[in-house]
């Protein structure tokens, strides 16, 4: 039942759930910017362009001791299935630890 529910969730909800659970986030803000890109040539022939481009701001204690590049690689790795399934772009505008926010 849980697996079926996860598959019926929209991509934005799945991304939020995946990152929240894996990174024990203090804050996560996910913006759907797909409407800005739906007319791009790379999106021609894509059956659903409603959830292809996102922008992320995230705060997690799991980032402690990691470089910015390592943080981004971690996030992209966690979302590999989404990228394989049609996620086209994720712009990480902020990835900080709670101490870096304070």
Swiss-Prot record:
Knocked-out gene: effects: Leads to delayed spore germination and the unidirectional cell extension is not followed by cell division. Proliferates faster with smaller cell size than the wild-type cell during vegetative growth, but no other significant cellular anomaly, such as defects in septation or cytokinesis are detected. Sensitive to UV light. Shows a normal cell cycle delay after UV irradiation, but displays aberrant septum formation and defects in cytokinesis when released from the UV damage checkpoint. However, chromosome segregation is not affected.
Pfam families: BolA (PF01722)
GO cellular component terms attached to this protein's record: cytosol; mitochondrial matrix; nucleus
Compartment(s): Mitochondrion matrix; Cytoplasm; Nucleus
GO biological process: cell division
Inducing factors: Expression shows cellular growth phase dependency, with the maximal expression at the diauxic shift. Expression is rapidly decreased when cells approach stationary phase. By UV light. Expressed maximally (3.2-fold) at 4 hours after exposure to 240 J/m(2) of UV light.
UniProtKB keywords: Cell cycle, Cell division, Cytoplasm, Mitochondrion, Nucleus
Superkingdom of the source species: Eukaryota
Family: Belongs to the BolA/IbaG family.
Function, in words: Acts as a mitochondrial iron-sulfur (Fe-S) cluster assembly factor that facilitates [4Fe-4S] cluster insertion into a subset of mitochondrial proteins such as lipoyl synthase (LS) and succinate dehydrogenase (SDH). Required during the last step of iron-sulfur protein assembly when the iron-sulfur cluster is inserted into the target protein. Probably acts together with the monothiol glutaredoxin grx5. Not required for [2Fe-2S] cluster insertion into mitochondrial proteins. May be involved in control of cell division, especially during the resumption from cell cycle arrest.
Name of protein: UV-induced protein uvi31
Origin species: Schizosaccharomyces pombe (strain 972 / ATCC 24843)
